[in-house]
Amino acid sequence: MQNPLGSFGAVFAILSAAFSSLVSAAGMVATLTPSLQAPVTVGTSVNWTVSVSGAADGAIWYRFRARHVGQAYQMIRDFSPQNTLEWTAADHEGWFEIEVSAKNTTTSERAQTTSLYEITSRISGNQPAINPTSHPLVFLYSAPPCGSGSRMQVEFTAPEGTRTRTPFKTCDPRFSVNFYLMGLYPDSNYTVHHIIDTGMSGTSLVPSADLNFRTGSLSATLFTQTVVKAPAQKISNQVLLGSALGIPVATDLKGGVIWYGPSNVTYITRPEPGGTFWAVSVGSPDDPSSQAIRKFDATGRTVLETNAARVNEQLAAQGRRNITAFHHEVRTLPGGRIAALADVEQILTDVQGPGPIDVIGDMVIVFDSQLNVVWTWDTFDWLDVTRKAVLGETCARVAGCSPYHLAADANDWTHGNSLSQTAEGNFLYSSRHQDWLIKINYDNGAGDGHVIWRLGKDGDFDFASSDSYPWFSHQHDANFEASDPTRLILFDDGNTRAATLGRSNSRGQVLQLDETNRIATPVLNADLGVYSFALGSAQKLRDGNYSFDAGGVLGPGGPSAFSMEVNGSGDVLSEIRANVMLYRSFRMTNLYTPN
């Protein structure tokens, strides 16, 4: 297929190179080199390496951005010490421009260069194509261009007959349409075809002929899932994604592996619609540039990334405190902004004990799509610093902290572990060590950050229950139901309840909130039969049931996690056990559809 830009690309390359030389002419010069000479086909992985000459002494950091020629640049990785980037164009062919900016962090000297790179179609004639990727359970399906006003999706069928459809993509008659196929069993034969939705009455869906392909073998060492109680035959959300503290794994509800993630992330925080994932990556404790949040695609390739050191540059410019690391939460918000949790460390004197005490709090950070910090909220500004962690947790004793640097031990004061946006545009923040859920005035980015209410023992709500200890404690993954913003779902680890009453099981809770009168009424208080001392998740499923993950269970067989489906009466309908602890688990319709 002829490239729609024709010879323009060669002219643009000359102009681009000339511009780059002008930008870098002052002294420091950056050179960008690809691992493969262009052109390459859609989906081919290219490793870009930056070299710098003429720089004064000092550490050099690099920022990578890319764009399809004629469009705006999209951030891939913000400034960091990494001078290489694995990149591909997986959507369509064309001329792409890779940009790198280099800066000397000591002298502030900068250099910038760009490289024009041609990606060609995988289509020969008018026939679709199916090709493997670097991941044995991910394939690239390429379809010929389709007409304006139409859209396309791909359907693939497993050996036993299960069908999966990708999300639709909008057609552009200039370009082929390409899809990552994910959610595939290893060593299995599949059939696949694409479907064009023309939007015309009577002939809307037009399928292509089938292609056949066979998946690869598993090569990674993965954790396993074992069925404890089998689910019913007809059940919603048939994919289980387990966020291990290591390689994440997706299985069916029988434990059959259908995907696994990269090894360069510490844990997944959220799957995103369309088949991408957000994760936290914990690096060297003494290097904030290695403390990262990363969005990656089906093959594990980085789509978007920043790090604590780069964010601290922005926070300093705004007069905010520094962060030490990201933890527990990063997710895309409605409207495309990105929210993350990070640790803040301060020495407080005669506040949480006699003399100077190192105290760890949290910061909520909101980024725009280009990773610019646009809003922050700091527990040291808005919460009572004299209210210590409910069970007196310190970092050395509990060993659950991100890196800290100001003392040999620190009070793990808040230990935030989830953040979600409410229907009216505020934030719901979970503080494990305060045993509170806190509603923050975010107001879709226009809020001043004041605390609207605190839900939990000794907070702002009464609990309408006769239970001997109705309140959740050390809770995880609190979120409001999408269909009913007055119903709150959470996983109640129950640490404080267990410390107060003796041995207790963790619970899956659904609470009806009357925010006007500050009353919480239990709708579901399910005893899950195990005690999870940490970790956990909570989710409402499409069929109206709930999924709870007891992520940190200690027993004679070693650490494990239990993912359970529970009905509205608290009955456990199905249960599957992982042979490792899981930070969170997600019941998904498929790997493109989180719920």
Regions found by a protein language model. Give the residues of each.
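Solvent-exposed loop segments of extracellular immunoglobulin-like
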Residues: 56-62
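Conserved aromatic beta-strand anchor motif in extracellular beta-sandwich/beta-rich domains
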Residues: 62-68, 154-158
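Surface-exposed, short loops/turns at beta-strand junctions within beta-sandwich domains
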Residues: 88-95, 181-189
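Histidine-/acidic-rich catalytic cores in large beta-rich domains
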Residues: 121-140, 145-156, 178, 185, ...
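Short, solvent-exposed loop/linker segments at the N-terminal edge
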Residues: 38-44, 129-133
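Short beta-strand segments within Ig-like beta-sandwich modules, predominantly Fibronectin type-III
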Residues: 75-82, 168-174
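Acidic, Ser/Thr
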Residues: 49-55, 142-146
